[in-house]
Swiss-Prot record:
May associate with CD21. May regulate the release of Ca(2+) from intracellular stores. It comes from the Eukaryota. GO terms for cellular component: calcium channel complex; cytoplasm; melanosome; mitochondrion; nucleus; plasma membrane; vesicle; vesicle membrane. It comes from Gallus gallus (Chicken). This is Annexin A6. The keyword Cytoplasm applies. Transmembrane segments: none annotated. It holds the Pfam family Annexin. Belongs to the annexin family.
Length: 671
């Protein structure tokens, strides 16, 4: 139940008028005869607290001389059986069973070890160790040590001690020192001093560590998660990231784990079951709130879409409510949103591409290699890919000139005649300057039947003033008309106003103005009808002012605006836009907000969506891989693996052929 002095945040509560003997009778009747009444079983068990379920087990034994868990195992099957049986165990014994399964047999389920040991309180760890000893007559630490290795093992052993300082222990004089020690142990040292990391992350109180992470961000300019990813790899990296996430917000950590358990093809049912069971009487309401905020979908609806039968019914009972139906935003979610904007506002991100200028570059030599690859019968696509994906755009422009000078031929025309399909689109795109390529993509988005609004927004919302100016010039030169005219003639009124404003390239590029940020946040709140005091402005006037703020304020300033917005309304701006706006304008506003928050994450999400499910959106995939290859594709790779538990390289690799080879070359490596 809830810790003393805190509001209960579980979804499962004690059943009023509880009678263990009557419940034991009801379960016995549900399992009598041919078949069993699964609905009766799930309705009863999911509506009782764990303490009440244990009393039912005792009453069942007393009345029928039989083991209730054994009978349930006999009557039920599959995922539903695993879920119901998990509910019948005390939490510590349920954790012990999960860990025993994780280390039994060949191989170890490291993710299960990480999830449990990174997220439990001191008391929960002590109870787990005792339950493991009682259930299996074995020492948990000895089994973990025997089944793991290296620094991963050392960190698990530290966590198994359950010796973290309690949350009211904050050594303010040590905060700055711990932050410096973490920085010196990682970023500033050749190799990482894991012992220092392990001690601080494994022993300091959560409240103390939150202050350490804030201090670390100030002195290093980057969140500690980014440093961990850069310095470490494998299970040790995953464990440390899990500890950091649980320190920041256990609810957010579990929301992310639940989302990853259900997204994409297939469901990780063991993960889904264990989290839904283990958090149902602790913080399920907080998890639901964070889930709704982060993924713009309620946990209830995701379970509903991803599962079936009695298994689904039981999970939904544990979830308890549908936050999409409530359409509310909650304090826990607001805290998470505020922290995300705070991180975005103060982090100093070093943008890094995957394609660098080739050393010992020889434009004439490359021109000769390309000519040889296209002469005679057949084409050597491999040679073309190897040269052009390993040169910077500036070097490719030199190759174009050298090819013309050496052979009197147009390299673009030759490539176009020799290549076809997706590979041709990719290689020809690489040969254009960034501005020419963006101009061409914008032209394709506005010509023909229908307008590709998503592409228009992606390009216009993510380019800086200098890039926008170059695109305008390239567009005029290539198509003999202004980009603004084409955008105006092919889009709706409000959407047109937004695109034209972005096309002017008049975004301020200075730092934030805190006074102005507060005033801008008021305008945003009034526009989205979340202000305490109604505005005298018309809705059209407010929308125009909101549009102006989004299109002309600097990114650092907008981050502060959206942070102020959370403080002012207890809502996240992206969530509010999705709820209160519609159509192309809503999608464009959301794209701008997500780009402001974290541009690499914005592109990582678009890349994932271009490849998930059946078929690949090659146009989007090609466009982003080309346009970001020399800017921030390395950052995008980092965000991709963090968001989707799979590297960008692995996601691309599922395809085959020369197009895939070229994409992998641009990707630049597997994370």
């Amino acid at each position: 139940m809830a810790p003393k002095g805190k509001v209960y945040r579980g979804s499962v509560k004690d059943f009023p008028g509880f009678n263990a003997s009557q419940d034991a009778d009801a379960l016995c009747n549900a399992m009598k005869g041919f078949g069993s009444d699964k609905d009766a079983i799930l309705d009863l068990i999911t509506s009782r607290s764990n303490k009440q379920r244990l009393e039912i087990c005792q009453a069942y034994k007393s009345q029928y001389g039989k083991d209730l868990i054994a009978d349930l195992k006999y009557e039920l099957t599959g995922k539903f059986e695993r879920l119901i049986v998990s509910l019948m165990r005390p939490p510590a014994y349920s954790d012990a069973k999960e860990i025993k399964d994780a280390i039994a047999g060949i191989g170890t389920d490291e993710k299960c070890l990480i999830e449990i040991l990174a997220s439990r309180t001191n008391q929960e760890i002590h109870d787990l160790v005792a339950a493991y000893k009682d259930a299996y007559e074995r020492d948990l630490e000895a089994d973990v040590v025997g089944d793991t290795s290296g620094h991963f093992k050392k960190m698990l052993v530290v966590l198994l001690q359950g010796a973290r300082e309690e949350d009211d222990v904050v050594s303010e004089d040590l905060v700055e020192q711990d932050a410096k020690d973490l920085l010196e142990a990682g970023e500033l040292k050749w190799g990482t001093d894991e012992a220092q990391f392990i001690y601080i992350l494994g022993r300091r109180s959560k409240q103390h560590l939150r202050m350490v992470f804030d201090e670390y961000l100030k002195i290093s300019g980057k969140p500690i998660e980014r440093s961990i990813r850069a310095e470490l790899s494998g299970d040790f990296e995953k464990l440390k990231l899990a500890v950091v996430k649980c320190v920041r917000s256990t609810a957010e950590y579990f929301a992310e784990r639940l989302y990853k358990a259900m997204k994409g093809l297939g469901t990780r049912d063991n993960t889904l079951i264990h989290i839904m069971v283990s958090r149902s009487e602790i913080d399920m309401l907080d998890i639901r709130e964070v889930f709704r905020t982060k993924y713009d979908k309620s946990l209830h609806n995701m379970i509903k879409e991803d599962t079936s039968g009695e298994y689904k019914k039981a999970l939904l009972k544990l979830c308890e409510g549908d936050d999409d139906a409530a359409a509310e935003f909650f304090p826990e979610a607001a805290q998470v949103a505020y922290r995300m904007w705070e991180l975005s506002a103060v982090a100093k991100v070093e943008l890094r591409g995957t394609v660098q200028p080739a050393s010992n570059f020889n434009d004439d030599g490359d021109a000769q290699v390309l000519r040889k690859a296209m002469k005679g019968l057949g084409t050597d696509e491999g040679a073309i890919i190897e040269v052009l994906t390993q040169r910077s755009n500036a070097q490719r422009q030199q190759i174009l000139k050298a090819y013309k000078a050496h052979y009197g031929r147009d390299l673009l025309a030759d490539l176009k005649s020799e290549l076809s399909g997706s590979l041709a689109n990719l290689i020809l795109g690489l040969m254009l300057t960034p501005a020419q390529y963006d101009a061409k993509q914008l032209r394709k988005a506005v010509e023909g039947d229908g307008t590709d609004e998503s592409t228009l927004v992606e390009i216009m919302a993510t380019r800086n003033n200098q890039e926008i100016a170059a695109i305008n010039e390239a567009y005029q030169q290539a198509y003999h008309k202004s980009l603004e005219d084409d955008l105006s003639s092919d889009t709706s009124v409000h959407f047109k106003r937004l695109l034209v404003s972005l096309a002017l390239g008049n975004r301020d590029e200075g730092p934030e103005n805190l006074t102005q940020a507060h005033e801008d946040a008021k305008v945003v709140a009034e526009t989205l009808k979340l202000a305490d005091v109604p505005s005298n402005d018309s809705s059209d006037s407010l929308e125009t002012r909101f549009l102006s703020i989004l299109c002309t304020r600097s990114y650092p300033h907008l981050r502060r605006v959206f942070q102020e917005f959370v403080k002012m309304t207890n809502h996240d701006v992206e969530h509010a836009i999705r709820k209160r706006m519609s159509g192309d304008v809503r999608d464009a506003f959301v794209a701008i907000v997500r780009s402001v928050k974290n541009k690499p994450a914005f592109f990582a999400d678009k890349l994932y969506k271009s490849m998930k499910g059946a078929g690949t959106d090659e146009r989007t995939l090609t466009r982003i891989m080309i346009s970001r290859s020399e800017i921030d594709l390395l950052n995008i790779r980092g965000e991709f693996i963090d968001l989707f538990d799979k590297s960008l390289y692995q996601m691309i690799e599922k395809d085959s052929g020369d197009y895939c080879k070229a994409l992998l070359a641009l990707c630049g490596g597997d994370d």
